[in-house]
């Protein structure tokens, strides 16, 4: 059992028969009354997100999530296909369940498949990935790193804000947790 006050982003727990992943969690102390935990959560099975509050001492069953190394193969229609790199088993995951993760991975990228028992519940991508810029505004002469930046579309369709000196065709390192530009590769 885990108390609500110990829940952090990325953790998974069971509540009311649902498997829930914490997206955001914060303590809130109103002017009057007791402290509450404000949370943004996602139902792992349905993909729906919702906001809720809990008392800090409420207890939940922490879900045991196992991960296996895998490779992203391809996407067809509304299904993404992955292969376990140890057993060569293939997994089909609805695109709706891994939509955000697919913005950071290319075909043949290494990932980790997350399991709850025998049920595939998600994909864990590396903390940083290298992607190529496919579309952005032309560079401005004399641009510096301190400028406000410009939007750039990457090869997966992800749009990130980049410094003004970045050009089409350059490889960038992207932070997958924040969805932000880190540096040129």
Swiss-Prot record:
Q: Which UniProt keywords apply?
A: Cytoplasm, Elongation factor, Protein biosynthesis
* The keyword Cytoplasm appears for this protein: yes
What are the protein's GO molecular function terms?
A: translation elongation factor activity
Biological process annotations from GO: peptide biosynthetic process
Going by the entry's taxonomy, the superkingdom of the source organism is recorded as Bacteria
Q: Return the GO cellular component terms, semicolon-separated.
A: cytoplasm
According to its UniProt record, where is this protein located? Cytoplasm
| UniProt xrefs under InterPro entries | Elong-fact-P_C, NA-bd_OB-fold, Rib_uL2_dom2, Transl_elong_fac_P/YeiP, Transl_elong_KOW-like, Transl_elong_P/YeiP_cen, Transl_elong_P/YeiP_CS, Transl_elongation_fac_P
Q: What is its main location?
A: cytoplasm
Pathway membership, UniProt? Protein biosynthesis; polypeptide chain elongation
Q: Name one Pfam family in it.
A: EFP_N
Q: In UniProt terms, what function does this protein have?
A: Involved in peptide bond synthesis. Stimulates efficient translation and peptide-bond synthesis on native or reconstituted 70S ribosomes in vitro. Probably functions indirectly by altering the affinity of the ribosome for aminoacyl-tRNA, thus increasing their reactivity as acceptors for peptidyl transferase.
HAMAP family according to UniProt: EF_P
Similarity-based family? Belongs to the elongation factor P family.
Q: What is this protein called?
A: Elongation factor P
* Source organism (scientific name): Streptococcus equi subsp. equi (strain 4047)
Q: Which gene encodes it?
A: efp
């Amino acid at each position: 059992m885990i108390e609500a006050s110990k829940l952090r982003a990325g953790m998974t727990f069971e509540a009311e028969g649902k498997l829930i992943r914490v997206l955001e969690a914060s303590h809130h102390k109103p002017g009057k009354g007791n402290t509450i935990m404000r949370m943004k959560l996602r139902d792992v099975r349905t993909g729906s997100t919702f906001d809720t509050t809990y008392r800090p001492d409420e207890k939940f069953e922490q879900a045991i999530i196992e991960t296996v190394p895998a490779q992203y193969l391809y996407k067809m229609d509304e299904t993404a296909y992955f292969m376990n790199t140890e057993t060569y088993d293939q997994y089909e995951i609805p695109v709706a369940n891994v939509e955000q993760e697919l913005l950071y991975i290319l075909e043949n990228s290494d990932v980790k498949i997350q399991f709850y028992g025998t049920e595939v519940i998600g994909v864990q991508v590396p903390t940083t990935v290298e992607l190529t810029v496919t579309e952005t505004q032309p560079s401005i002469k004399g641009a510096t790193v301190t400028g406000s930046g410009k939007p750039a579309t990457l090869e997966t369709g992800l749009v990130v804000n980049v410094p003004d000196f970045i050009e089409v065709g350059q490889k960038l390192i992207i932070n997958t947790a924040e969805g932000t530009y880190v540096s040129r590769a």
